[in-house]
Amino acid sequence: MRDNFNYPPGAVQLLGLCRLDNLHQAVTKEKQILAMPTWRSWISPPSNGKGEFESVNEIKNSEYYKGWQDFLRDKRLLDFLEEQDKFLIFYQHREMRKFPGLFESHSPRIIIADDSSYDVQELLMESAYLVTDYSSIAMDFAYMGKPLCYYQFDYKKFREKHYAEGYFSYEADGFGPVCYTEEELVKSLFACVGKDFYEEEKYKKRRKEFFTLRDTDNCKRNFQAVRELVKNSREG
């Protein structure tokens, strides 16, 4: 950021995100799995802009809908949840919650969450495993030292129409396996959750190298840094 946007010396500092302080209070529920995909700008543009789809029925023909709905009703998943005595909470991005009733549950083991009953940070803190796609909430989950996987069945379209690829490579830098098919997703989920949340050492190593600050002083550091910048600007 400093090099690309020409910030002056001292303006860019490694301080940690304030919201991460609360994550140290996490109490994980071993029976709870969280699936939390991000939105798609071509389906639900911000500020009510026009997308490719104008109704719930049209969205149900999209690759996005089919990818996630097929996963939620996969018989292997439903049987696995029953056998392992687990529950999966599916929580959509707020931009996708503009379409109530879009996704359906075919099992009491799968809960389609609505924002009025659930808090995002609490879900992250409580859940033992995360299935996401491109969402930055994977950072929060990895920060807590918990396993996850990325489900990116529409990778090419997402990069073309939503966000171009940046400095972070999911394959090289991600905190869990990248799955491009439902088969790969089910296999990764079962391999981890079915073996007492086992994960490969390389993902633990990536977490340790990425999160160099792991304490409850993020708010304090940010407050002190802002105060110092304000002080220096007044004196300058």
Where are these regions (language model features)?
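Active-site-proximal region of nucleotide-activated glycan assembly enzymes
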Residues: 1-22
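Catalytic binding pocket for nucleotide-activated donors in carbohydrate/polymer assembly enzymes
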Residues: 7-9, 103-107, 134-210
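Short, well-ordered alpha-helix to beta-strand connector turns
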Residues: 9, 30, 85, 126-127, ...
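Hydrophobic/aromatic beta-strand patches that form the interior of the parallel beta-sheet core
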Residues: 13, 34, 89, 111-113, ...
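Short, solvent-exposed loop/turn segments at secondary-structure junctions
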Residues: 18-21, 38-42, 93-98, 117, ...
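Conserved catalytic-core segment of nucleotide-activated headgroup transferases in glycan assembly
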Residues: 18-102, 179, 214, 218
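Donor nucleotide-activated moiety binding/catalytic core segment of transferases
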Residues: 94-139
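C-terminal alpha-helical cap of glycosyltransferases
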Residues: 215-236
